[in-house]
Swiss-Prot record:
Residues 1-32, 75-149, 222-260 are annotated as: Disordered. Residues 439-513 form the PAS domain. This is Transcription activator of gluconeogenesis ERT1. It is found in: Nucleus. It comes from Candida dubliniensis (strain CD36 / ATCC MYA-646 / CBS 7987 / NCPF 3949 / NRRL Y-17841) (Yeast). GO terms for molecular function: DNA-binding transcription factor activity, RNA polymerase II-specific; RNA polymerase II transcription regulatory region sequence-specific DNA binding; zinc ion binding. Residues 96-106, 115-149, 222-252 have a biased composition (Polar residues). One of its GO terms (biological process) is cellular response to starvation. One of its GO terms (cellular component) is nucleus. It comes from the Eukaryota. It holds the Pfam family Zn_clus.
Length: 560
């Protein structure tokens, strides 16, 4: 009898243990805990207030715990950052268990019951979501990348929209049809002049490069003035297109800005073909005629973009010619000028057909391979005739007080040049010239893919290499700058004030600053004496193996 009682007792204890051994349901982890759970290192849930705070009576103060900011977000205001809780709440399923199509767009959606294509009853969700039955078949799929480009607060420089979607007639028609609030908000000009504007580039690399450098130039050189000495009738067209000189005809028109984008011939050609075959929407039919006027340069009506460089007719369209045409449009046809710039910011697309790799050697000979340099360069380059020609040109152009200032700057570095070269033998001088041509051949490969207007000159100021983008920017033909039996100096391309600054900067970095790089502001002259281009210039000084300045690489960007 006792044995039976013990068996019953053991069976009861075993059943009790089995009941207690049932695993409790694990609490789902959330990506972001509340402030109380975060402080106590406890598991939290996505609800606010969370269950733990409700049990402890802390529901009124339960909120997301602040996260440590990344370094790149230190200067971003809190209002511009979207909390993860709002992102998580937008990823829920609707009442029918259907995932909303791209609901993370954060677009202003109209109510479902107002859509003429809706076949389902409206849900009780606060934010209506488009289901596949709600959207017609001809509507293109809106990815988050496309939607972010249409957002007026979007500050990321992206060229994807303008490469693939800006010229699509279906997209231009669908956006105002299904998203009228978004369409009005996107095309409503901003009343805040300090609001950062989006850029319209066809290349992401050029987009980031030009936008960053333009911001630096505006901050550092916004208070500088441009010299017009020497040409009293000259006009600087860069400030004329700045936001401060907008016509007062339309106060709601956004201020235009000029952006210079460089792309290869293949990319621009495909973009032109896509624009050619696309049919403009009915809303833009009346404005299409404004861009077909033969008096003005070729312009892409969808993004207000002018084309520079080689054209189909074989004519080279240069930057000064376009600036002159835009200035004439502003004076003669202000309505057309305002109409073009009210739709989108002014931008430029450059198409360059590069020749084979070659740089001009001495006496106009071409070097395509390094072996040619070592075989053909058998004599040192004589810098003495270059100095004599430079001084003769300066005496012809400048007055005596300005010549005195230039002579003071040259007196600080020319004796050092003479002293350094006196100890060199003829083979050393030949080797110096071979190094110059070899370095120039290497730079030629980089300059052709950078898209930045670039020019290279020797320490005497004699131009040795010109990039195609520089010719498009200034309008100077390459044959006139580095042609055979041609000797052009960099000072011939600068205005009077910039020439003085050039000698001062060069005297400072020739032997004093071995980093050899500086940024300054200068004004470039063009073949048209009435047109000047205010630019920011980045000078990189390259030295030879003897520590003597060998070449200066100048990169120019227009200040807009």
């Amino acid at each position: 009898m006792n044995i039976e009682q013990e068996n019953i007792t053991n069976t009861t204890l075993t059943n009790t243990n089995n009941v207690n051994d049932k695993p409790k349901p694990k609490r789902k982890k959330t990506s972001r805990a509340c402030n109380h759970c975060h402080k106590a290192h406890m598991t939290c849930d996505p609800g606010r207030p969370c269950q733990r705070c409700i049990q402890r009576g802390l529901g009124s103060t339960c909120e997301d715990a602040p996260r440590k900011r990344k370094k790149y977000l230190e200067d971003v205001p809190n209002s511009s950052l979207m909390s993860s809780h709002s992102i998580n709440s937008s990823d829920h399923l609707d009442s029918n268990g259907v995932t909303p199509m791209q609901s993370t767009l954060s677009l202003p959606m109209p109510p479902v019951q107002e859509s003429p294509f809706s076949t389902s009853a409206p849900t009780q969700s606060q934010v209506p979501a488009y289901t596949p039955s709600t959207v017609p078949q001809r509507q293109p799929s809106y990815s988050p990348q496309v939607a972010s480009n249409y957002s007026p607060n979007h500050k990321t420089y992206s060229a994807t929209l303008f490469q693939h979607s800006a010229t699509s007639p279906e997209l231009m028609q669908t956006v105002p049809e299904y998203f009228p609030e978004l369409h009005n908000q996107h095309y409503q000009p901003s009343a805040n002049p300090n609001q950062k504007r989006r850029t319209n580039f066809l290349s992401t690399a050029a987009d980031l490069e030009y936008s960053t450098l333009s911001n630096i130039l505006q901050e550092n050189f916004g208070h500088h003035t441009t010299s017009n000495e020497g040409t009293p009738n000259s006009h600087n067209f860069s400030p004329a297109l700045s936001p401060h000189n907008m016509p007062t005809t339309d106060t709601n028109a956004p201020p235009p800005s000029i952006q210079l984008a460089s792309n290869d011939q293949r990319q621009v050609t495909s973009f032109n073909n896509h624009t050619k075959h696309s049919t403009p929407s009915p809303l833009n039919t009346s404005q299409t005629k404004l861009y077909e006027d033969a008096r003005y340069p070729k312009c892409d009506e969808t993004i207000n973009q002018y084309f520079l460089g080689d054209t189909e007719s074989g004519k080279m369209v240069v930057f000064p010619d376009v600036l002159t045409a835009i200035e004439n449009m502003k004076n003669n046809d202000p309505a057309v000028y305002v109409e073009r710039n009210s739709k989108s910011t002014l931008s430029f697309a450059m198409s360059i057909s590069h020749e084979s790799n070659s740089n001009n050697g001495k006496d106009g000979q071409l070097f395509k391979e390094p072996e040619e340099i070592y075989e053909k360069v058998k004599k040192p380059f004589s810098y003495t005739p270059g100095y004599h020609s430079l001084i003769a040109y300066l005496r012809k152009r400048f007055t005596k007080p300005m010549l005195v200032k230039m002579a003071e700057s040259m007196a600080t570095y020319r004796p050092s040049f003479i002293a350094c070269t006196n100890s060199l033998k003829e083979h050393d001088l030949i080797f110096m010239e071979q190094c110059f041509q070899r370095t120039l051949l290497t730079y030629d490969n980089y300059i052709k893919i950078s898209g930045t207007p670039t020019i290279v000159w020797r320490r005497t100021g004699e131009v040795a290499y010109v990039g195609n983008e520089f010719c498009v920017l200034t309008g100077w033909p390459k044959e006139e700058l580095i042609g055979k039996d041609k000797r052009k100096f960099i000072v011939e391309l600068l205005d009077d004030k910039s020439v003085l600054q050039y000698f001062q900067v060069f005297s400072r970095i020739a032997f004093g600053d071995f980093l050899g790089a500086t940024m300054t502001e200068c004004t470039l002259l063009t073949p048209n004496p009435n047109v000047k281009i205010r630019t920011g210039c980045m000078w990189t000084l390259k030295r030879d193996v003897f520590g003597i300045p060998m070449m200066i690489v100048g990169n120019f960007l227009p200040i807009l």
